[in-house]
Amino acid sequence: MKKEETMNIVCSTDDNYVPLCGIMLTSLFENNKGHYISVYILTEGISSQNRSLLKNITQRRDYNGEIHLCVVKDNRFNYCPIRSGDHVSVAAYYRFLIPELLPQNIDKALYLDCDIIVNGSLSDLYGTDMSNVCIAACAEHTGDSYTLRVSEENINRLGYPKEWGYFNSGVMLLNLTYWRQKKVTDDLFAYVMRNHDKCLFHDQDTLNAVLGNKKKFIPYKYNFMTVLFTDGNEKRINPVILQERPIIIHYCTAVKPWEWYLVDYPFKKQWEHYRKMSLWKKWRGNKPWPERLKRVLIALLYKMKGKDVIFYDKSWKRLTKME
């Protein structure tokens, strides 16, 4: 990727997630100062105060870029299933509209979830050759037997060939030209309407099923999922993925680093670093006090039993040296 090339970044948020979005964007700008960055934030609507805060990110530290807010309103989302107890909202499906919402002269964009920290340059990732593919993303599995089995279960449920693979939709490089030419957005909504019972993982299932073999898999360092370090996973880690410094850290577990009562957490130091650097340095999460207290007590019980909410082993210690 040439330095003068604009890097187009897309994310989505509501008022509740604005702090996470802002902290993620701070880490993005801080680690990619050599490029002009245009950020497009998809939202159903946020307060004027939050709108101003997000817009001020680029001005505060003289970052080289701009932030646009794209209001999403589309009746097709009425057909997108959100079940009782799901930990996502209909906003998970907003990424279906990225090629329509972004200016038509933009041919490539990188989508990032908000529970992410950018820990290095995205230049090589953004320069990925996208010839004849729609999306470049990281495999949901990490090459070990457990996550490979889970991915195969997803593929079997969706009913497509295993060789097409299954990716995580938290980080996606999008070929918008291909997407528009092949009318992928129409195919995605049509699939959801016909197969809502199959889409256990919402937009991620839909994207994997519809895109078929038009996906390209990228190194795991571009979507390093902290779920690897949760209790019980210590024997599942594939040593291969620990050989490179994580560039994008994805905090994709139920327990998050911004839940202040945890003494430690994989890559919490990075998240705290960018929180303190951001306009949300005093933010400590949205959970009400009763819920915070409940989680503190659970953590204390684990400690009393000689256990940790998050496990640490030699693999984790190796990674901390690459932080």
Feature locations, PLM:
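N-proximal low-complexity "stem/linker" segments adjacent to membrane-targeting elements
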Residues: 1-30
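A glycosyltransferase accessory/donor-loop signature
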Residues: 2-6, 13, 176-323
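Short loop->beta transition adjacent to catalytic acidic/histidine clusters or analogous donor-positioning motifs
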Residues: 32-40, 67
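Short internal beta-strands
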Residues: 38-45, 137-139
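Active-site-proximal specificity loops/subdomain of glycosyltransferases
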Residues: 56-100
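GT-A fold catalytic core of metal-dependent nucleotide-sugar glycosyltransferases
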Residues: 75, 91-146, 166, 173-174
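A short, conserved beta-to-alpha structural element at the edge of catalytic cores
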Residues: 136-158, 263-267
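A recurrent flexible, glycine/aromatic-enriched loop bordering the glycosyltransferase active site
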Residues: 159-171
